[in-house]
């Protein structure tokens, strides 16, 4: 089986901040390098929700892409989140990411305004037409308010540059239906249900817990793809407490706390997000320590 265009394991990376809340570009590059070299990531997703994209400026987003591209070179794909609820602005960010050296684009469904499925098709098509970069659609109705319906995904798959989906909808049968009718590469957008998506044809994971579990999750995915299902599930069960525990608070906040616990400081989150409570943090630190990650 050929490897999917973005690889099998990507981490939706947090954005390191300095003590005074500025984007720490040096630490950004160091974290990206760490995720590739130590956690065996095939790709890094920047400027996504976990990267605090709602609170970073357009110019900061461009500098983040450049820093990560410089840090990982050709060792990993760099996928830039460019999704907004404004088609024109999304296209601007797509151009900016392409100029900054991104290898692909992550484009979320327009949020808050709840466009029709026809509007969603027009939006994604316009963004796909704007650059030569391959696109991963991001289907996360719990945050956007609007799902990408099965028939919409099947229609969008006809576009040559729409090649993948980050699926955080959690409806595995619907995902299987799309995969049966298209060549879209499906990545789990929910760390804990990765084996379920793999079982119906998914290719990998865009993860959050993979800041800590990346190497082990790659083992899970590789074993599953190779047909070593018992081995895959055994490893998965060992790390499952981390896959779920990282979401006991907002993902970015728990990741930043967990990295600091392991001696790799990346600063705090920008408002309105807040860091985990001491109780939440200590519980998660215990999970990390017991799992020996």
Curated annotation (Swiss-Prot):
SMART domains: DHDPS. It holds the Pfam family DHDPS. InterPro entries: Aldolase_TIM, DapA, DapA-like, Schiff_base-form_aldolases_AS, Schiff_base-form_aldolases_CS. GO terms for molecular function: 4-hydroxy-tetrahydrodipicolinate synthase activity. GO terms for biological process: diaminopimelate biosynthetic process; lysine biosynthetic process via diaminopimelate. Its EC number is 4.3.3.7. Keywords: Amino-acid biosynthesis, Cytoplasm, Diaminopimelate biosynthesis, Lyase, Lysine biosynthesis, Schiff base. It catalyses: L-aspartate 4-semialdehyde + pyruvate = (2S,4S)-4-hydroxy-2,3,4,5-tetrahydrodipicolinate + H2O + H(+). It comes from the Bacteria. It is found in: Cytoplasm. Transmembrane segments: none annotated. Pyruvate binds at residues 50, 206. The active site is at residues 138, 166. The record marks 49, 112 as: Part of a proton relay during catalysis. Belongs to the DapA family. Homotetramer; dimer of dimers. This is 4-hydroxy-tetrahydrodipicolinate synthase. It comes from Cutibacterium acnes (strain DSM 16379 / KPA171202) (Propionibacterium acnes). The lineage of its organism: Bacteria, Bacillati, Actinomycetota, Actinomycetes, Propionibacteriales.
């Amino acid at each position: 089986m050929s490897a999917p265009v973005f690889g099998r394991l990507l981490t939706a990376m947090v954005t390191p901040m300095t003590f005074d809340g500025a984007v720490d570009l040096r630490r950004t590059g160091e974290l990206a390098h760490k995720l590739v070299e130590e956690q065996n990531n095939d790709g890094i997703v920047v400027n996504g929700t976990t990267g605090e994209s709602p609170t970073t400026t357009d110019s900061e987003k461009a500098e983040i892409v450049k820093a990560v591209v410089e840090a990982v070179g050709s060792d990993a794909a760099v996928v830039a989140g460019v999704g907004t609820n404004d088609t024109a602005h999304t296209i601007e960010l797509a151009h900016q990411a392409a100029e900054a050296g991104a290898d692909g684009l992550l484009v979320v469904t327009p949020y808050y305004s709840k466009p029709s499925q026809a509007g969603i098709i027009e939006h994604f098509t316009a963004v796909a037409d704007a650059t030569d970069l391959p696109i991963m659609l991001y289907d996360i109705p719990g945050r956007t308010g609007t799902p990408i319906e099965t028939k919409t995904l099947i229609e969008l798959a006809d576009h040559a540059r729409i090649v993948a989906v980050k699926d955080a909808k959690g409806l595995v049968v619907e995902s299987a239906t799309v995969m049966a009718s298209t060549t879209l590469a499906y990545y789990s957008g929910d760390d804990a249900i990765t084996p379920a998506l793999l079982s119906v044809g998914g290719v990998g994971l865009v993860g959050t817990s993979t800041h800590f579990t990346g190497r082990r999750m790659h083992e899970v995915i590789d074993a599953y793809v190779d047909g070593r299902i018992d081995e895959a599930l055994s490893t998965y069960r060992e790390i499952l407490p981390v896959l779920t525990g990282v979401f006991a608070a907002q993902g970015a906040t728990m990741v930043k706390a967990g990295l600091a616990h392991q001696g790799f400081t990346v600063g705090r989150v920008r408002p309105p997000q807040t860091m985990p409570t001491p109780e939440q943090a200590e519980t998660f630190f215990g999970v990390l320590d017991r799992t020996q990650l």
